Each structure stands twice: as C-alpha cells, then as structure tokens.
C-alpha cells in the first residue's frame, strides 16, 4: 500500500516549501503526537504524564510554569466501614412495596435502613503544585509544546530573542519520580525561582482538618509535608510528603524561604518524589518520610540521560506492543486543538488513530501493576473537592476505563482493577450479610480507596446491586484473553462469591416464572411508571426521582453473563458441580430481553418508558456491548429494538456516553455511524488534549471508551470468532493495526486497502484452535509451511495452532 511513511515525507516537503522558517520547524507524527502553539490556560488544557502512581499536568507556560502533582493514594479520610447492621430486617417490606407498585415507600425505607453510613464516599485529592517563575524578555516566539506518545515525554520549546529554551517532563516508573529538565542552546541562560506549594481543602464541612507545611531542605531541595482532611466524620489518616531535589549544571543554586533559586545555569534537572503512609485499604502504617528518602537514595548519582533512558525503555515495553495507523491528510499536521476543530468539515482519519493511541497512553500512565486502578480522572486531579469525588463509579465509568485494556495488549494494566475487586469482597461480604441477609459478597455503584461496599449517595443511585457483578465479569474477560488457569484458580472464589450472593438475593417475580433482583435500578434513569413522581428525598435533601424497581434489564443481562462465566469456570477447574447446576437452572429463569410496545428494548421488566429518553446511559444495551447476550448473529430478532434505543437517545451526550455508542454501533456492524459519533465527540465532548468531558468536568472514561470503540470497529472476538474489520467506516479505506489482542489467547497484526484485508499475522499464545473471519479465501503458513485449515462457514476458517508460533495469512 502507499504507506503513511510516504505521505509523511510529502507533507514535510510541503511544509518546508510554504514556511520560510522550515529549517527550524518540527513536523510531528500525526498518529503519535499531541502538540500546540500556545501554553495551557486552564488545567483541562494541560498535558498529562504518569507512571501509574505519580501524575502531573504540565501547562507549558514560559513566564510562570505550573506543574500540578498527584500521588494516587492521597485521599480524604482513612479506613472506615459503611455497613449498617441489621438492615436486612427491612428487606422483605421494601421488596413488597416494590412489587405492589409503591416505589416511593420502598425508596424511603431503603434510604432509612439500607443506605451506607456515611452516605457518601471519600475524595481523591491534589498533592501539590510546582511553580517555576522565569524572567523572560519581550521577544517570545516559535513556541510549541507537545506530548510524544512514543516516549511518554512532554516537551516545551520557545525562543526568547536568540536563545532557544527547552523543557522535558516525564514520570518515571523505574525511579518513581517526576523529572523536569530545563536547558537552552546557550550557556548560563537557565535562571528561575521554584516553589512547591501545598493545597488545602477549603470547601467542605471539615474545614481545617487537613494541613501542610512548606519548607526548604538544604540549598537544593523543597518539600511539602501534610495530612489529609477529615470528611463526613471519617478522620483523615493519610500523611504525605512531596519533595523536590534539584541538580544544576554550572551556575548557582540556593534556597530563600520556601523558594529554590537558580541563577545562570547551563541546565537543571528537577526530581520530584512523593509518598504517603498508605499500605492498603485497611492499613496506613507506612512512614511516608522514609519512603521519600528511599526514592531519593535510589535516584542519587544517576545522570539525567540514564534516568530518561530507563523511563522511556520501561514505557515503550508497554506502548510499542500495538500500532494503529490510518491515512494522513494535510489537516493531520495542524496543531491538535486546530485538528479537532477542523475535523467537522475536513478529512483527518489519523485523528482517530491519535485518540486510540492516547487512550493506551492514559491506561499505561494511570494503571500499572501494584498501583490503584484508574479512577474517574485517572490519576490527575487539581481539585480538593473534585466532580463526583474523582472516585470509582461502577455503574459504567470504572468498567469503561478497562474495556480496552485486554485488546490493547496491556493485560498487566488490568491488575489494579482485579486487585480492587478482590479487596471489595472484604466489606462486600459484610454488606451481603447485614444489608441483605445473604451469603457471598455484593457491591453497588460507588467506592473509594478504602473499598467501601454499601449503597452510596442515595437510593436513586445506591440500589444498583450488580456493580460488583459487573466488575466480576472483567475477571473472566482477563481469563478469556490469557487462558491462564492459575489466574482463574486465584479469582474463582471471587466469582463464586458474587454468584452466591445473587443465588440468595434473587426472588420470584409475581408471575411465578422469572427470578428477579429486588430492589434494583437501571443506573440513574427513572422509569415512566405509576408512582415514579418528583419528590423530596430525605437522604440527599434534594427534589428528585426514584429509580428503585425490580429486575432491571441490565441486572438480568449482567447476571446472565456472570452465571454463565461461573459455570464455565467451575467446569474448567473441576469444582462445585452441584452448585454450578443450581446456577444453571437459576440462569434459565432470569428475565429475557423484552421488546416494548414502542419497539425499543425494554429497560425494565415492565413495559415502561423513560422520563429521560435522551439519557446518557445505555444500561439495557449492556447485553449488546460490553456483554454478549445480544448479537446480529445470535439474536437477530432483537437488533431492531436495540437500534431503536440508539436512535431514540441520539448521537449526543457526555464523553462516556459517546464512547459507549461507538462500541454499540460497532457491534451492529455500522462503522459509519460509529465514526460519525467519534467526530461529534471530538467537536463537543473532548478537551484539547483529548481527555473526555462529562458535560464539562474532565474524566478519562470517555477517553478510554473511545479507545475501546475504535478497537471494536476494527476487530471483534466476543462470539468465538476473530472477525476482522467488522465495522470499518467507508472512509477508512486503508490502514494498519498490529499487536492487538483477541480472546482465545491470540495476538493479531493486519493491514487493509480498499476496505479489504491485504495481509494478516497471528501469534498463538496458548495453542488453542483459531477461528477467523477474514472475508476472502486465504492460505495459512508458519515458517513457510502451509497449515491445514477448514472453512466452517462462508469466509470463516478454522485451524489448529501451537503456543508461541507465528502464523501468516496470505490472501488469495
């Protein structure tokens, strides 16, 4: 194919011709670089770096640089419980109210006796800000800042008069530090004042329960020491320390009060380390000062080049596994913010590749083995009272953060989520017993670093009892991609525990035929049914609607998946056959997907409409995506009803809503619609550095949902068949996708031109039978030897594989 490489060369020559200063111009790779011609004015425009634990947002200012800092375990509060003892005594009455069509009575009783105490969770906090003050001249020009996704480094460059100034900023995983390098092309030109500032929580009811102290440490270091805030009666038990250590090359360096002053250096390297006393959700016994000192000891004596090389090598060991390239156009070489504006009326397919690659970057930067999972904002947060507390919301958002993790060949990055699910079983088993009188474990729609599990916020949100079940499906997905039986044995008790709860919790529908969850809800969306009136909620102190019901469609679909996964796990491991049979019989009695009188898939067991028909969630389409109950192949009779839901709710909404819609339309094989939604997302619900908006607050769920949606457009594997280009937009007539993973333990690389596969390669990691839909006849070869294949349907081939072997697919 006429590769992107040749197009890149063409546009480099074009820009050289039209730009008089071309000798000094940098032409960025459009699929792997976010770049801008001006500094960030707002936090939402800053560029992120992260190593899974330490995050920073870089503004790139030339007069007063701000680098906002986060350490992932700095939260309000401390270990606490939300369990309400004896709440289960009220459950039968609540269930009776719901079955009798008295939702407000059920809502109030649930609010009084089954809601968590305290009713809200804790907040993720900002750790500190680093400010660098420069005395620039009046001739600032040739400014640019960029994030290189191939290295994970943010760059800032500008000229002041005849001097070229450069900065490099990255977050090193090997050295657990944020590194800032300042240099210029002339000697003795680096001068600035630096201040490391703490941040206070000024806006909540426990004002003045947090504190910090700013100090200089010798002549070359600054530090902030502090304590987290109390919140909702939970004592702040996090102690933290952030320390900056400077190394100058030539020039002079000193501290003045809380400032570090550098004069006339050739270059300066700033090393920022941070730590808290957090050990786990129930242990805060570490010494944050010892941890910081240990980080500094380990990095002492290393050169900047060595630190940089180690960080880039580590980062690339994740990022370089996958490559997505789509055709470039002239607009592809615009600054990223201008590309986003131009997309509405111009061709720029590679912007989708950039969005996909940025999603992988965010996963690598916010979720590494041994860290916390990515929260609503990943690991980046400037506010002490952030939107939705920057917590873990599990009625869509946390799950969406990890939809792409396996296919994006970042399986290790799922480890923090898997660990969190295991940890939730601790308090989750208490909630199951005390709130519901059930065995196993349960978790609802919100949690925090302390792994609380009871219903949070209010009954309108908290009655989502399948949040833990949904998270548990991710444990099974990890197995499907890896086929690691040792891992499956490890998580089997977690999967079984979730199933055990619902086997106790499910009750018979009044028709005597179905089993349903009760109470239940369809996340955040009230049904348009009898008794669902606007009312004053005593738990939240708000006028609102109740969502409480029984047997919501999403509940039934999640449990259909969960029960099926458990049955398969028990069979694979040879465990609990009698219990697995009970689960199989219960699964058969779950409410099937139903089509309402308006032609849409019903959101509830009863044929009710929605009070918000443009709602941002698509809960009742879980079975289409990310679930596997509904598909064009298996349930063609439901496809029109699913499309009717998507048409009813439209292509707009929040960032996360649009990411979900992209994947849903991809499962319906309509790539043109998915791409149309992507364009609308870029125009209306993405910040200039491709972070998603949830209305206006920055969140990573939409960023990562879009990443998953793009992957789903190009390859699917949820039905046991590797389906290449299932939802390819007509405009993406050629491209390359390499290193992507699919279920069954396979890694794929393929190229296409004129909307048809031209080349494909498969690595078998587990030695399983490979079934692939490629759309053309082909030959399978390994080491030049032809492999026997069987055509099991039109364009679908099956062949045996050996673990660790590469197979070439030659298209005929």
Residue ranges of each PLM-predicted region?
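Bacterial Sec-dependent N-terminal signal peptides
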Residues: 1-25
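Aromatic-residue-lined binding/catalytic grooves and analogous aromatic/hydrophobic interfacial grooves
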Residues: 24-460, 466, 475-479, 496-499, ...
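Short, surface-exposed recognition loops and adjoining beta-strand edges that mediate ligand/DNA contacts
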Residues: 35, 373-391, 502, 508-525, ...
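Short, solvent-exposed positions on alpha-helices
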Residues: 190, 350, 412-415, 485-493, ...
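Acidic/His metal-coordination segments adjacent to aromatic residues that form catalytic metal sites
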Residues: 378-389, 443-463, 520-550, 684-696
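Non-catalytic carbohydrate-binding regions of carbohydrate-active enzymes
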Residues: 477-478, 482, 486-487, 498-508, ...
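Acidic/histidine-rich catalytic neighborhood
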Residues: 497, 501-569
